Amino acid sequence: MKVLLVLTDAYSDCEKAITYAVNFSEKLGAELDILAVLEDVYNLERANVTFGLPFPPEIKEESKKRIERRLREVWEKLTGSTEIPGVEYRIGPLSEEVKKFVEGKGYELVVWACYPSAYLCKVIDGLNLASLIVK
């Protein structure tokens, strides 16, 4: 079984979703990949460009570090290990970045660590993959 955990920069309460992903990995022997989509960074960068404002590059790094810290904290609590499977960071619209990432990789399940919304439902519909939204 191949599982993808999707984290976003807009939703910090990801412990339950990470717990599900860890359980799939440990109890079912699932291969686990983690994708962190920095959609808020993308939107902020677009707004700055639109208004001709400079975009501080440290915002991208700070967002990555914030997700990484939270993931490491929860991962260590659940597994006792600080070794996390590779996390891929993407900056862009959630729908586009997830779709590009899953293409041709054979995922059977996507675990979403984000708040359910009409937008997320559209993203999920476009993937045609089993999905579990954990809020």
Curated annotation (Swiss-Prot):
Coiled coil: none annotated. SUPFAM superfamilies: Adenine nucleotide alpha hydrolases-like (SSF52402). It comes from the Bacteria. It holds the Pfam family Usp. Gene3D superfamilies: HUPs. Belongs to the universal stress protein A family. This is Universal stress protein Aq_178.
